[in-house]
């Protein structure tokens, strides 16, 4: 089954897998588009849209180890919910938002391992 990707309004190169918005709302428990976490994500997506790979110099963007194909995360570490958004660069510098989750287990990294697996499967479904 191939996942659909949808271009996000207001961005040139940012796309999200179908269901991403609902997944994000569930993770941050926030339905208001002008809420704290929606505003944070929108700001970070503007940086990503404008800067591409240069965004990785921002401390809130990080490459993910052991991901294949290579993926990255946007983080909001000092927030109560500690959300993460996993994304990948694809053709022509487009960015696909693949998965969002709440990091709760820093010691074991199990949240990341599980989330990376979900994101890898979604990306493979899209590019196949």
Model-found features: residue ranges?
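Basic, Lys/Arg-enriched alpha-helical interface segments
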Residues: 1-82, 90-95, 102-128
